[in-house]
Amino acid sequence: MGDKIVWDLYFMAMSKQNKLLRFLKKLFIALLLFLIAYSGYVVIETRNVKDMTIRQKVLKAAYPVFTWLNKITGNKSKVFTNESPASSPQSIYDLTIALNSGDSIPLSNYEGKKLLIVNTASDCGYTDQYDDLQKLYEENKDKLVIIGFPANDFKEQEKGTDVDIEKFCRLNYGVTFPLAKKSSVIPGPEQNPIFQWLTDKNKNGWTSKKPSWNFSKYLINEEGVLVNYFDPSISPTGKEVMDAIKK
């Protein structure tokens, strides 16, 4: 009888393990951010951050821990791969990007290179991925173009103007890859035409996967075929992205 009770308790504990881990993760992050905000401000100030709000500085400092927590709590980051890439019903090279600077550029200019398209935000837990994106761009610019699409769709984490966004990215992360004009990236009447293509399988020929949060990533190959989707928690310099770029 005693053994049965022990086993029952064991299985109950196992069934609640994931829920407990999620709770502990949130609690740990909350405590961490509190401690950073009140005792780590001087340390954050020494990390070459300029024109950042307190929130942005805290998020920047917390990003490595946030990434580590995702790993140890078994976060299932999603990567979708197009196993049978074929020409899309509508060519992405027919589309034009309205840039942050006010200029426009046709995507046909990038034909023959891979394209990594990322929806971005300045006040997100993943904002420090700008650093990884810039590093990825610098190391692969002969074969890869990265384009950031600032958007305020997720918890209003990009409230700045195009001028604010450009300044923030340039001063704090040294961003030199193209930034699009701020727009909406989720399905709806205001959705950016590029993301209309990315999230409609009738246009791209593969998937209707919409961004799950800021810093969702879409990879398009040299022929203009959408071949990968990476969740926000996938680092731009992680193995998943690097392997896809090398193909």
Spans of features found by a protein language model:
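N-terminal targeting signals for export/organelle localization
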Residues: 13-92
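A short beta-strand-turn-helix
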Residues: 94-114, 135-138
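Short pre-active-site segment immediately N-terminal to redox-active cysteine/selenocysteine motifs
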Residues: 113, 120-123, 150, 223
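Structural microenvironment flanking redox-active thiols in thiol-disulfide oxidoreductases
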Residues: 126-192
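Thiol-/selenol-based redox modules, centered on thioredoxin-like
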Residues: 193-196, 201-247
